[in-house]
Amino acid sequence: MNKKNLITILLTLVAVAAGAQDKVSWKSFLKAVEFSQRDFVDTIKVKIESGAVIVPVEIAGRERHLLFDTGAEHGFWFGSQEEWMKPINADSTKWHDINGKTGMASLVLVPEMRMGRLGISNYPISVGGHLGDYICGRFDGFIGFDLVTKGLSVKLDTKDSLLIVTDRKGFFDEEAKGRPSVKYWLAKPTYPMVYVELPFGSTYMSFDTGAIGHGIDLSNEVLAQWLKKKKKRETIEGATLLSDTTLNVNIGRSGCNADTLVERIVHLPTVQMGSLTIKDAYVSSANMSCRVGSALLKHASLIIDSAKKQYVFLPHDGTSDIILNDKAHHSMSLVPKDITGILQAVIRKGSEAYEKGVRTGDYLIEADGIPIDDVCTYIAIRQQKKPGEEIHFVFRSPDGTKKRVVIARTE
């Protein structure tokens, strides 16, 4: 497979599109949220996807799966409304998605959701749009950061695939002692940001566990500000490995939208986030915003301390650093061309796919002998492959030329 997991890209774009995009006043809704227990600790078995945590919950007697998304201000549900949902009167509520489209938001309450032994009542979520078209049943929606601001502290144990949740202040203090950490501040009532120091400048970013598989992302807009200053420009240009035209695809509630832009790939030997040192990061500028994604949690577990407003990192190897070494992350990706789900390639110069003749804009028409005319068909094929196993691709260029290549799945 490609050097970048298709699901990683699609889910990342979805998370960005759903998180922090609503023009909604949620304060009154969140006041009504109640927990069934006090002074509790619970441990829940979860699924880990490229460092992201997918949590099983029970709703209306059925197990569903929600992505724990620190980049989403509030909960979100894909697809249409279901019988168990309690409608909220939100006639004046509008949404504005990442593609500049607007519409009326459909807000509902989850009357009762059970996460492990903890019951959560009256949890408000936003419903609908086209986001679910690109998820293909991988999970049903998001848990937003609003549950943390309601007083829950959690440990995302990505080493043992566990979620530990508690309302006890100081519960994780002993485990967190001496470990790298960073304070977060709430740019909005339920939207945390962290201060990140790069070799050529510093900025606030979202630490977004819903940016599945992503390391550190910059935007051309922010990079342009640093490029105006001579010393910073020299540092950026010295670290730039590639500058090339590429496609940037955003998936919002209204569907997907592709733009052509110039992307820089910048190698950063070190990045500082509080007392955490992130090493060997390869950063793309082809993004709508600056963020740090779930790739960090492929190498470390995470404690979110709601009382201290702090992220604590527990590197799996016992050190105080995280080595990303994510150059392959930017080599090749497959993104939806439009709402139909037809996939087109985004290829970095010098990559294996590039050397084999695949180019940005080529369409994926076949994988392992099966025609590909939608996202979910390809995902089903890919999930049958283990890392290192090869997939036989057939691409078609815009001029009709067919290209047959074999590339192994990398993760």
Each language-model region and where it sits:
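Pepsin/retropepsin-fold aspartyl endopeptidases
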Residues: Q21-E411
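Bacterial Sec-dependent N-terminal signal peptides
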Residues: M1-V24
